[in-house]
């Protein structure tokens, strides 16, 4: 009986520690890293990118996000990658400029009030 009580106590302690470990949020501050690079993909399939410069990753990389939300790792030193980044930045800038509110010249309106005593 004493043996089973000790065993039960150990199981309860283990379950407590396991539940504490499992309660930790997944992926806290874990960067996305690229370990291999993909070949060039068509620019028309790319909608955005992210630079990976974390010290936790073995190498710097660029992750392109496709229209189908797939991530493609690329070497930032390759010319096609640099060209894509420049074109995507240009696209983003154009979108920001087209959605910015248009400013117009101020209207020169002069408000005048009539003197109630001087009504004609």
Curated annotation (Swiss-Prot):
Pfam families: IL8. Processing at the N-terminus can regulate receptor and target cell selectivity. Deletion of the N-terminal residue converts it from an activator of basophil to an eosinophil chemoattractant. N-Glycosylated. One of its GO terms (biological process) is sensory perception of pain. GO terms for cellular component: extracellular space. Glycans are attached at residue 97. The keyword Disulfide bond applies. Disulfide bonds join 33-57, 34-73. PROSITE patterns: SMALL_CYTOKINES_CC. Residues 91-120 are annotated as: Disordered. Residues 93-120 have a biased composition (Polar residues). InterPro entries: Chemokine_b/g/d, Chemokine_CC_CS, Chemokine_IL8-like_dom, Interleukin_8-like_sf. Its main location: secreted. The modification Pyrrolidone carboxylic acid is found at residue 24. Keywords: Chemotaxis, Cytokine, Disulfide bond, Glycoprotein, Inflammatory response, Pyrrolidone carboxylic acid, Secreted, Signal. It is found in: Secreted. GO terms for molecular function: CCR chemokine receptor binding; chemokine activity. Acts as a ligand for C-C chemokine receptor CCR2. Signals through binding and activation of CCR2 and induces a strong chemotactic response and mobilization of intracellular calcium ions. Exhibits a chemotactic activity for monocytes and basophils but not neutrophils or eosinophils. Plays an important role in mediating peripheral nerve injury-induced neuropathic pain. Increases NMDA-mediated synaptic transmission in both dopamine D1 and D2 receptor-containing neurons, which may be caused by MAPK/ERK-dependent phosphorylation of GRIN2B/NMDAR2B. Monomer or homodimer; in equilibrium. Is tethered on endothelial cells by glycosaminoglycan (GAG) side chains of proteoglycans. Interacts with TNFAIP6 (via Link domain). Belongs to the intercrine beta (chemokine CC) family. This is C-C motif chemokine 2. It comes from Cavia porcellus (Guinea pig). The lineage of its organism: Eukaryota, Metazoa, Chordata, Craniata, Vertebrata. The gene is CCL2.
């Amino acid at each position: 009986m004493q043996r089973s009580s000790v065993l039960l106590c150990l199981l309860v302690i283990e379950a407590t520690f396991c539940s504490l470990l499992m309660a930790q949020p997944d992926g806290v501050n874990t960067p996305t890293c690229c370990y291999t690079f993909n070949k060039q993909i068509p620019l028309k399939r790319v909608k955005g990118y992210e630079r990976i410069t974390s010290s936790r990753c073995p190498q710097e990389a660029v992750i392109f996000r496709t229209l189908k939300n797939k991530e493609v790792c690329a070497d930032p030193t390759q010319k096609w990658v640099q060209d894509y980044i420049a074109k995507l930045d240009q696209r983003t800038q154009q979108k920001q400029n087209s959605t910015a509110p248009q400013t117009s010249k101020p209207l020169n309106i002069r408000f005048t009030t009539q003197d109630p005593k001087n009504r004609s």
